[in-house]
Amino acid sequence: MGEEIDLEIAKMTDRIAVVVLKSPSMSDVDAIAAASGKIQQFVRENQPQTLIFDFEAVKFFSSLVLGLLLDIRAKMTAYQGEVLISAINPQLHRVFRITNLDRIFRFFPDRESAVEAASSD
């Protein structure tokens, strides 16, 4: 059996939730699929206006994580929801720039500033 992605999903308000990614490495196909299932279920059941992905602990991820983020974004866009990304390290942020995904996600230096921005939207 492969790695398991440690994550926590917390509702900050009725409109804002945070997915705290606690695993330093996110590359196992089955683990990413399982994490995606948990997050998608949360989105279906709660329909947060804003979902913040906190990458503070993450040092490496495979391209499957980009797919996960795009899938969640597509589901949330259907009801005018938004995905924000916080505390991502510069090397991982570079992946978003290279793929032009930095144009569709908003980035914040830390979880607190992302929550603050979402609260003022």
Locate each region found by the language model:
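STAS-typified acidic loop motif
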Residues: 4-37
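Residues that form or immediately flank small-molecule/cofactor binding pockets and catalytic motifs
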Residues: 14, 90, 112
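Amphipathic alpha-helical interaction surfaces in cytosolic regulatory modules
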Residues: 26-104
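Short acidic-hydrophobic, aromatic-tinged amphipathic segments that line or gate anion-handling sites
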Residues: 106-110, 114
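A short, charged, amphipathic alpha-helix used as a generic interaction element across diverse proteins
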Residues: 114, 118-121
